[in-house]
Amino acid sequence: MTKKMLDNLYKFSLEGKMTDIILEIEDDNSIITMNLHKNILAASCSYFDRLFNGNFLDSNTQKVKINVSNSLITKNIIKSFYGQENDVIDIPDWQYILEEIICKDYLGLDYDTSTLKDINVPSEYYDLLVYVAGIVGFNNPNITNLLTDLMPIDYDLTNISKDDIEFLLNRTGDCIFSLQGYESRYKTHRKYRLKILDSMTGNIIKTTNKYITKKFVYDFMNNEVICIDFDKNTSLIKCLKLSTNSEYEIKRSHNVENIILSNDGKILISYHIDKSETKFNSRRRSKEIAKSCLFKFFDVSDKKILFSFYIKEVVEKNTHIFNNHSDSEDDSPYCDELSKFYFEIKFMDISPDDKYLVCCFSTKFCLCLNIETKEVLWTTNLCNINNDNYYFNNSILSSSLYIVSLKDMIYVLDVSNGNTLKKIKKYNEGVYSFDDNVMMIYHSSKIEIYDWKNDKTIRTIKSTEKLLKHVYNPRTMTLYSSNNYDNIVSYKFNNFDIDTFTNRIISDDCDEFVFVNNYNKKIQDKLSDYLKTQNKTSEYDCVGSHINEID
């Protein structure tokens, strides 16, 4: 049927000409009456086809009443049968999308759930979202994220079945944050599109159309990604709210270099270097001079600064000053001023009890700050002045040990005083700790289980392919690594006595990835606690941990 014919039929409908059915569309607020054509209704909608061609109505019936969720939206749906545009309805977009699905489901029509993906439903209308989930299915990927991201913390879960609660619970907890990169407009830095994957199956939990940088942390208390972003000639901290896909900037966060989140999720710590000017030595080689270096401690709940701690003098006083071959610092008339390089931090770690902040600088100078007393507990230099190994792998901080992995050396420090307990001369690409005695040393195609106290290799486990970027989840003893095909591969360790290990690919093309323990933790705890009250066994409790990502 041509557009002109449909337009004429709708004109007849408005004028009440040559119509054979009066349809009354009723909701809780109004009744809309339309003069329509049975053949148009039956040909466009299975509900009306059954109504008119079944035994539900007398053949002489000229008026039918239907009760719907929203009469105005239903009128628009019927207008679409005639090829007409929608009337403008004074309700929010999210409400129109949800109620249109309800109305289309009532009429037996197909609906497009992709419109659900980015809507933001107010907490007082969460029941409406749950009702729509019952129509499209709780496992529909376009609504599942909304159910967990937008759930009010005080929501009555008795409105949701236990099976659906268990399904939603599986969408929280252990996750892989997979990053796919692209060059920024001016190619000054690289940004990534975030995709959240289930750590066991690799199934996509959530995607976002926003871009973040590699330097980020996940705020599990507020379900936000906090990252270092770039604006003109400065760097700053931005937050991406995963529930609404919206961004905002943290005030007083400029010239930021590093960020880390406390294990309890309450404090965000950032490190800032303010550059004063660029100076030149007698050979006209430039040197960026740092004006000040400081840590800022933010309250995660309101993003306000709790206190700041300046460390420029501490670094200048305790770090080794060295010559860099032909470009000698002594050749500069400003040799008493250290370049920005001396103040750059490679790793920032917080102890499990959130009491200590330990940092490793580019010069392999280490500093431990007591967060409670706001005092420097200890400083140390890992290498002598002439050591030129600048290839950093990763660091680990436990309650008793601080471990730093360089390309050809692993340092084990006593976290209470900074004393070096062990220097392990091994070429490696990273190290993870099983406990205070045993560590996992990572090589390109093998893993060495090593007892560092007794200087003994317990087991060497060979891999079938080269292992690239990697993170380790100590709670489940699972290692995640990327391979040559940009896929994430997981390795499950049963014990130390195995000769080989099996792998299972989490199929996803990625440039970078990070393991996250407590994705959407508040909702995770709420769902888990509810299931426990229903006499169900829950195994979803998570223990947070922090491991620096390997470059």
Swiss-Prot record:
Q: Which domain of life is it from?
A: Viruses
* Gene3D superfamilies the record matches: Potassium Channel Kv1.1, Chain A, YVTN repeat-like/Quinoprotein amine dehydrogenase
**Which cysteines form disulfides?**
none
Q: Where is the BTB domain?
A: 19-90
| Family statement drawn from the similarity comment of this UniProt entry | Belongs to the mimivirus BTB/WD family.
Output this protein's name.
Answer: Putative BTB/POZ domain-containing protein L76
